[in-house]
């Protein structure tokens, strides 16, 4: 139908990050975030002192949330809500459960006391999604586990690493 054709081509109307996220293209998501962070953010935005640990996390959270707002026609975009045993950072719930995957995003800043690399931090974010059972809300709505994707975002200053739960 004409509507379906328009809908499929509408992916090209999304920003590069959103298009990569919806298509599960992890490499492109990483390239986009790192290019934007390097060219746009200052160390003032992203924080450099341990006392500012939650600030960079909030900054990146707000930035990614801003990128995702344009999805609100296709997804419920939820931020800092309770599910399972804690509060997830961002959850995208498809308005049509047969159209697209549900997505859970968790953000973490590299903690040099417990982590050595951005990989450790991204893994820690993914582990938090599992351990705190953030999928509970999605599963209670009838979305199957196969349709749920998890992304852990790790930050250190203007460096970003995004990993996906395999």
Predicted regions and their residues:
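Extended alpha-helical interface modules used as scaffolds for assembling large macromolecular complexes
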Residues: 1-133, 160-166
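Nucleic-acid nuclease catalytic cores
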Residues: 122, 133-164
């Amino acid at each position: 139908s004409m509507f379906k054709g328009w809908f499929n081509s509408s992916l090209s109307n999304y920003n590069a990050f959103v298009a990569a996220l919806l298509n599960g293209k992890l490499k492109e998501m990483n390239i986009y975030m790192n290019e934007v962070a390097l060219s746009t953010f200052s160390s003032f935005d992203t924080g450099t002192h341990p006392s500012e640990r939650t600030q960079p996390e909030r900054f990146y959270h707000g930035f990614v949330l801003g990128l995702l707002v344009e999805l609100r026609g296709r997804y419920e975009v939820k931020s800092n809500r309770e599910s399972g045993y804690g509060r997830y950072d961002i959850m995208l719930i498809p308005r049509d459960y047969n159209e697209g995957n549900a997505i859970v995003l968790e953000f973490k800043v590299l903690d040099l006391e417990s982590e050595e690399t951005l990989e450790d931090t991204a893994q820690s974010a993914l582990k938090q999604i599992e351990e705190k059972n953030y999928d509970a809300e999605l599963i209670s709505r009838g979305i199957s586990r196969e349709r749920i994707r998890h992304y852990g975002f790790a930050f250190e200053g203007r460096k970003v690493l995004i990993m996906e739960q395999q």
